[in-house]
Amino acid sequence: MDMKLQQVQVLKPQLTQELRQAITLLGYHSAELAEYIDELSLENPLIERKETDTPPLSYHKTNKNRMNAQEAGLQLSNPQKTLQDALKQQSLDMNLTNTEKKIFNYLIHSLDSNGYLEEDIEEAARRLSVSAKEAEAVLAKLQSLEPAGIGARSLQECILLQLQRLPNRNEQAEMLVSAHFDAFAQKKWKTLSVETGIPLHTIQDISDDIAALHPRPGLLFARPEQDVYIEPDIFITVKNGHIAAELNTRSFPEIDLHPQYRTLLSSGSCQDTVSYLSAKYQEWRWLSRALRQRKQTITRIINELITRQKDFFLKGRSAMKPLTLREVADCLSLHESTVSRAIKGKTIQTPYGLFEMKLFFSAKAEASGDGDASNYAVKTHLENLINQEDKTKPLSDQKLVDLLYEQHGIQISRRTVAKYRDQMNIPSSAARKRYK
C-alpha cells in the first residue's frame, strides 16, 4: 500500500496586536489605565487627556467590618520612615558606647518585618566577638524603645514586654503570660482558673486587654492603621425605588486629538513628518476606540448587575442572589473571560458601602433550601445572628443552622455553617463565649 504523508495547514484565528491591547486595557483599573495613557502620551504628541472633575471619595475605615474588610475593603499603605530609622533616632539619648552601638546596629538590622529578633542572641554575640552578657544588655535597651514589644524573640515575650510597659501593671496578666502562656492562648481557661485561683471573668478581662496589644509591633511602621479614602469606579444611587448608575469620569477617561494635528498636516510638511503624524494618528484613533469600547462593556455589565441584583441595591447585603460570570456573559453575548477582565479591580459605591465588582458574582449557598440564596447572603445572615447573640451563651453551629431555616428558609448543613464561619474569621461558639 502506497502511503503518503500530507502536511495539512490548519488556520487558527489570530488576535491582532490592537485586539490584544484592547483586551489588556479592559482589565486595567483606574490607576493602571491612567499610567498607561500617560506613557502613551509621552510617545505620541497627538494624545491629550480630557480634563475631568474630581469625584467624591468613598470613606472606608480599615478593619471596619469582617466581611467588608475581607471581601470589599481595599487597603492603601502610607509608608513612613523605617523601623530601623526610628530605633536609631531613639538610641541617640541612650549614650551607648562604641561596642554597644555596634551591637545595637547589628540587632536592629536582624529584626524581621514584625519587629521580632530573628537571630539567636548568643549567635549574634559570637559574630560580633562580644560576650552573650553584653549582647543581652543591649537587647534589653533595644526592648525598652518604642514601639513596645520591639526586639522580642517570641509572641510570648512580645506580649509580656508590652504588659510590663502599661501604666497600670497587672500582675495576674503578667503571671498568666509568663507561666501559663500555652494554656492561656489555647483558652483552657477553666483549668487555669482552678490552677491559679483567678476567676474566669478576670481571665476573660485579661484576654480582652491583651487583644488590644500589638502582636507584631514592627508592622506599626510598615502598615499604620488609618482611615482610607478610596475613589470608586461606579456610583450606585437609589431614589424612590429607582436604581441609577453613574461612572466616575476619572476611571473612564477620554482623550482628545491635539489641536495642532490638522494644522501640521495642512502646512505642507515633509513626507517624513506626514508619515509620522499619520502613524501617531492611527495610534490615537485606536486608543480612543479602545477606551470607548471599555466604557461600553463595563456599562453593559453594570446595567445587567442592577437588573439581576436589584434586591441587593434596594434591601442590602442579605438580599444578594447567586450569580455567575457565565450567566452575565451569555446574556450580553460576551465571553466569560471578557466579563472577568472587565470587573477585575473595579469598585462600586452603593448605599450599603463600597464593594468590589467581583463581590456581586456570588455562588449559590451549599444545599440552600430556597434555591435562591447566595453564599454571600448566607454569610451576612450568619454574621447578623452572631453579632446579636448572647455572648454568655453563644450560638452553636447547629443552632445557627436552625435559625437560618426558621428565619430565612435557608437550609444548609452544620458543616457548611462552620465553613462559612471560618471563611469570615469568626471563632467557634466556645471561643466566643464570655464569662461575665
From Swiss-Prot:
Pfam families: Sigma54_AID (PF00309), Sigma54_CBD (PF04963), Sigma54_DBD (PF04552). Induction: Association with RNAP core increases slightly during late sporulation but not tested stresses (at protein level). Gene3D superfamilies: Homeodomain-like, RNA polymerase sigma-54 factor, core-binding domain. Belongs to the sigma-54 factor family. Sigma factors are initiation factors that promote the attachment of RNA polymerase (RNAP) to specific initiation sites and are then released. This sigma factor is responsible for the expression of the levanase operon. The open complex (sigma-54 and core RNA polymerase) serves as the receptor for receipt of the melting signal from the remotely bound activator protein LevR for the expression of the levanase operon. Associates with the RNAP core only in stationary phase cells. Interacts transiently with the RNAP core. This is RNA polymerase sigma-54 factor. The gene is sigL.
